[in-house]
Structures are given as structure tokens and as C-alpha cells.
């Protein structure tokens, strides 16, 4: 007896016994274990309970307990013969980050605090980021997907040119790319993998938010494979803690970064990010360290202390700040939640 990767355990010994050996479920014949003694005015009922492996949880409207009826069918009181499913746990890293460490010139993430972080390599070995949001889907920016492609490139053209790694450089195959229908204003794309990835300590999706976590002052963490203080790509995942900034100040900062008539840079940035109702800004930390080239596509991860769960509040779109600008710019995940869910459901 098996059920979608679940482990089945016997609640009361009887004619059928299902045991858990490691992650395998083994049936034992009727005569392999003694029958329970009879009791006066009572009877023996055979029950099994479905449980999930580590890093998965049971999804069912019932309680996961099934009884053997007179027709030798396993049924649950609430859902009948319908079996439960084991869905991947999200936003529950085994080793959550517990101190401030940074991307630019910072310390390393040696503990797997960001198991949703993916490393994406595009044409000509340009490194960017992507964020695992389910067993088979990742978020990244449209700009990342179009790197070294013409503006006329299609999603079908782009997908074969990407290489994607999860966990400890686990290579995963890409099935397709889906661009946001308004990607010039909403810098987002989805990546679908050919197969679901096993969820474990090093590979785990981050949860999608059910509310907007981007109020000014909220602190989040951004991990990344982008360039370090020497402007060379790092071989190790690093991270930074940054506060959400005032949007008006952020807009004013970038509006003043160029002279409108001839676009002569007034500061080292000189590039205009996309800023609109779908974006928010995160400011420089007090350590004067920041995200940089190659970190785009990574998530602004928020730890909801009440739920003890990590949520993807945003996706880094503008990663050109590199300590010379005050703000990085992110796409609000909550604003595109409906598109994400509909796209995944229809694909």
C-alpha cells in the first residue's frame, strides 16, 4: 500500500499491518503478527494513518485515518476513498538566519538558511538569481530572462539558453518560461521545471504572501550570487538584511540620478529602474553594504514571527546599486499573486 510518498502506520494491530522502514512502506501478511485478543461486547477495527516524509505535510479534508470496511476498502469518515496528498513545506528553513551578514563583502551562508535561492546562468555565463516558490516553479525577473537576447525573443527562445542550480549546485532542467503579460512594467517571469524537485534541508520553496509585507521599516533578507566588493561574482551564497524604504524618497532619488535632457549621470548609478505601484524599495543597511549585479531574481524574504514562516515579499528587479545608490528596487509579490496562481494552475 502506498500513497503519494506518504508513510502509512498501523493504529491498531489486526489482519493487515503496514510498517515504516526508513521511507519505505511494507505490507506484512496476516499471519506475520499476532491477532489482538478479543474483548467482551467489543470488536477489533483495522485502521491506518497516512503520514508524510520530512519536509512534506498532509493535505486532506479528513484526518488521514482510514478504516477497513466490510468490502475491504480503506475509507475515511470525511472523504471516503479519496486519498490525501503530501505537499511540500514552504518557508521553514532548518537553519534560519540569525545574524546580520551581507552580500557585498559579507559572510557566507554555510547553513542553508535560504533553501529557496536558485542560481541561474544565462547566455555568455551571466549569473543571476531565481526564487523557488513550489516544487516545480520559480520566480525571477523578465530582465534576467532576456539577458543577451533581443527584445523580439520569445519565451520558447529563452528557455533552452538557461542553466539553473538549486541547493548544493543541483542542476535542474527547465521545461518552459512564462513572461508576465506586462513585463515591461512588471519585471517578472516564471520558470517551470521539467520535474518536481525533492524538498529537503537544502532545497525548499519560500511561501507566497497572503498579505503585503512591504510597509516602510519592515526588515527583510536578500540572498544572492551576485558580485562582491571587488565586482567579481562570488562562488558562495551571501545575504544582506535591509529595511523597506519610503517609496517617494526612492522615486525622488532615482529621478535626480540623471539630467533629463541628455541623461548624463549625476551619480555612479545613471540607470533608471522601473518604479510604479507594483514596486517597493529597500534601503542601504547601516553597514553600507547592498545587493549588486547578479542578485536580481532573488527574493526579499520576510520572517513572519507569529507564524514562524518565511514569505517572498518581493523579487529584486534593480540590482545595480552596489553601495553607490541608496535603494534597490523590488517587484511586490503580493500584487502579482493572482497572475502567479493562475499561470501555475493553467500550466
Curated annotation (Swiss-Prot):
Fetch the InterPro entries from UniProt. Answer: Haptoglobin (IPR008292), Peptidase_S1_PA (IPR009003), Peptidase_S1_PA_chymotrypsin (IPR043504), Peptidase_S1A (IPR001314), Sushi/SCR/CCP_sf (IPR035976), Sushi_SCR_CCP_dom (IPR000436), Trypsin_dom (IPR001254)
Superkingdom of origin organism:
Eukaryota
One GO cellular component this record assigns the protein to is: blood microparticle
> Where would you find this protein in the cell?
Secreted
The glycosylation sites annotated in the UniProt record are: 148, 152, 182, 230, 256
Q: List the disulfide bonds.
A: 52-86, 90-207, 250-281, 292-322
Region Interaction with CD163, residue ranges: 259-264
Domain Peptidase S1 residues, every copy = 103-345
The record describes the protein's role as:
As a result of hemolysis, hemoglobin is found to accumulate in the kidney and is secreted in the urine. Haptoglobin captures, and combines with free plasma hemoglobin to allow hepatic recycling of heme iron and to prevent kidney damage. Haptoglobin also acts as an antioxidant, has antibacterial activity and plays a role in modulating many aspects of the acute phase response. Hemoglobin/haptoglobin complexes are rapidly cleared by the macrophage CD163 scavenger receptor expressed on the surface of liver Kupfer cells through an endocytic lysosomal degradation pathway.
Under the subunit heading, UniProt states: Tetramer of two alpha and two beta chains; disulfide-linked. The hemoglobin/haptoglobin complex is composed of a haptoglobin dimer bound to two hemoglobin alpha-beta dimers. Interacts with CD163. Interacts with ERGIC3.
Name by which UniProt lists this protein: Haptoglobin
Amino acid at each position: 500500500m502506498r500513497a503519494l510518498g506518504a508513510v502509512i502506520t498501523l493504529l491498531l494491530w489486526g489482519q493487515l499491518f503496514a510498517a515504516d522502514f526508513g521511507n519505505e512502506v511494507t505490507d506484512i501478511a496476516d499471519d506475520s503478527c499476532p491477532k489482538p485478543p478479543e474483548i467482551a461486547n467489543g470488536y477489533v477495527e483495522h485502521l491506518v494513518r497516512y503520514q508524510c516524509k520530512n519536509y512534506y505535510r498532509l493535505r486532506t479534508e479528513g484526518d488521514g485515518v482510514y478504516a477497513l470496511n466490510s468490502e475491504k476498502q480503506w475509507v475515511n469518515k470525511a472523504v471516503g476513498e479519496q486519498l490525501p496528498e503530501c505537499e511540500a513545506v514552504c518557508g521553514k528553513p532548518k537553519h534560519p538566519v540569525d545574524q546580520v551578514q551581507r552580500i557585498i563583502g559579507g559572510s557566507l551562508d554555510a547553513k542553508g538558511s535560504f533553501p529557496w535561492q536558485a542560481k541561474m546562468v544565462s547566455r555568455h555565463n551571466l549569473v543571476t538569481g531565481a526564487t523557488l516558490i513550489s516544487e516545480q516553479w520559480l520566480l525571477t525577473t523578465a530582465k534576467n530572462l532576456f539577458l543577451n537576447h533581443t527584445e523580439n525573443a520569445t519565451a520558447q527562445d529563452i528557455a533552452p539558453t538557461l542553466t539553473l542550480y538549486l541547493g548544493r549546485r543541483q542542476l535542474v532542467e527547465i521545461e518552459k518560461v512564462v513572461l508576465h503579460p506586462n513585463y515591461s512594467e512588471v519585471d517578472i517571469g516564471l520558470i517551470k521545471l521539467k520535474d518536481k524537485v525533492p524538498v529537503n534541508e537544502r532545497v525548499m520553496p519560500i511561501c507566497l504572501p497572503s498579505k503585503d509585507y512591504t510597509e516602510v521599516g519592515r526588515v527583510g533578507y536578500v540572498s544572492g550570487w551576485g558580485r562582491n566588493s571587488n565586482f567579481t561574482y562570488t562562488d558562495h551564497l551571501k545575504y544582506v538584511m535591509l529595511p523597506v524604504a519610503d517609496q517617494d524618497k526612492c522615486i525622488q532619488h532615482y529621478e535626480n540620478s540623471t539630467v533629463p535632457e541628455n541623461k548624463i549621470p549625476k551619480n555612479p548609478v545613471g540607470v533608471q529602474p522601473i518604479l510604479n505601484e507594483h514596486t517597493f524599495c529597500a534601503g542601504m543597511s547601516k553597514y553600507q553594504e547592498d545587493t549588486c549585479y547578479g542578485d536580481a531574481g532573488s527574493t526579499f524574504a520576510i520572517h513572519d514571527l507569529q507564524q514562524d514562516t518565511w514569505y517572498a515579499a518581493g523579487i529584486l528587479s534593480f540590482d545595480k546599486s552596489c553601495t553607490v545608490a541608496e535603494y534597490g528596487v523590488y517587484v511586490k509579490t503580493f500584487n502579482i499573486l493572482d497572475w502567479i496562481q493562475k499561470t501555475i494552475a493553467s500550466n
